[in-house]
UniProtKB/Swiss-Prot annotation:
GO molecular function term, any single one: acyltransferase activity, transferring groups other than amino-acyl groups
Top EC class, one word: transferase
Source organism: Arabidopsis thaliana (Mouse-ear cress)
Domain of life of the source: Eukaryota
Gene3D superfamilies linked to this entry: 3.40.630.30
Name the record gives this protein: Probable N-acetyltransferase HLS1-like
Domain N-acetyltransferase: 5-187
Keyword flag Lipid biosynthesis: no
Amino acid sequence: MTVLVEVREYDPSKDLATVEDVERRCEVGPAGKLSLFTDLLGDPICRVRHSPSYLMLVAEIGPKEKKELVGMIRGCIKTVTCGITTKRLDLTHNKSQNDVVITKPLYTKLAYILGLRVSPTHRRQGIGFKLVKAMEDWFSQNGAEYSYFATENDNHASVNLFTGKCGYAEFRTPSILVNPVYAHRVNISRRVTVIKLEPSDAELLYRLRFSTTEFFPRDIDSVLNNKLSLGTFVAVPRGSCYGSGSRSWPGSAKFLEYPPDSWAVLSVWNCKDSFRLEVRGASRLRRVVSKATRMVDKTLPFLKIPSIPAVFRPFGLHFMYGIGGEGPRAEKMVKALCDHAHNLAKEGGCGVVAAEVAGEEPLRRGIPHWKVLSCAEDLWCIKRLGEDYSDGSVGDWTKSPPGDSIFVDPREF
C-alpha cells in the first residue's frame, strides 16, 4: 500500500524531538537478542555535518493541519578517487628504455546515503523509496556522478530496497575490525618509534603516497584539520635514522624519498564526541561477567587479562583511518600504531577502537580485533547517477574490480 508522502528538508527547530522519537522506535531490538543502539547526542546530522556538502530530509504523511513525521534520511557529497591514470615520460627519447611512468588519481563526485529510517508502524508503504529518490535528486542537482550506501550483509530489507527498487549494485565488501579498550594501557614494542605528524605534513604524506587509493577524499586537508581528528602517526624501526622521534623527522617528502626498510602510518578520529553506542538485550549474567573481567583488568593489570569492554552502557569509540605502510615489517609497524591508538582511546574514556579496511587489505593482520565484535563483511552498494563530472575517461566505476585497499573517510563512519 502506498500513501501520500511529503518529503522536505529537516528543520531542527521543529523536528528534533520527533526525529529522536522515530530513531528510538527504529532501534528497538528483538526480545532476547543483543542489539546495538546509537545515541546521536541531540544532533541527528552529526554523521554528515563534517562533509563538504550535506542534507537531511524527513518524510511526513497526513493532512496539512496534522502532519506526522514518519521517516528520515541523510546524505552528503564529496570528491574522491575512483581510479588512476598513467602517463609515460620518455626522458631519453628512446621509446624502449628509461621511461618514467607517472600515476595520478582520477576523481569523481561521490554521494553517500546513510541514516535511512522509517517508523516501524509505517513500513512497506513506499516511504523509504521516496526518501531515497528525493535524496538522489539532490545529489544529481549538485553534480554527483555516483551514490553509494553501506549496510550489513544480513539487513535484507535495506539490501532489497536499494538493489531492487533503487537500482544499486553490490560493490565492495570491506571489514569492520573492532578491538576493546582494556582497563590497562598496552605496551608498544620497544623496537618501534611512533612519531606524531603536523596536519600539513600528514596531508603531504597522504597525497604523495595514498591519493590513488580508492575512495581517497580530495579534501583530505579538511579531514586532518578537523577538530575531531586526534592526529596522524608514523611508526618506524627504532634503529632507523628516524628512530629518535620527532627531532629526526625530515618532512614527508624527504621521508618518502629515503624511507626506512619498513614503516606505517595511521590517523585517529574521535567519534565519541559525535555519537555514543550501547549494546542492549544482554542477560544479567553477561553483564556480571563483563564487569568482573574489567575489575580484574583494572586492579591486576600486570596479568594482561583481556577484559570485556563496557558495552552494556553508553560508550564512545575512536576510529583508525588512513592506514598504510610499506616493507617486510609493515604489519608490526601497524600493530604498534594500533596499540598507540588503544592507549589514546583509554585516555579518552572510550570503550572500543575500530577500523574499516578492504577485504584484501595487505596490512589487516596487523590490526588487533575481536572477531565477536567485528563485521567480517560490511556491504557497500553503488549506483551511477550521471556522467558529467569525473575528470577523465574512467568508464563506469560501478563495474571496476576491487583494489587491495580503500580509504575510509572517518567523517561518515
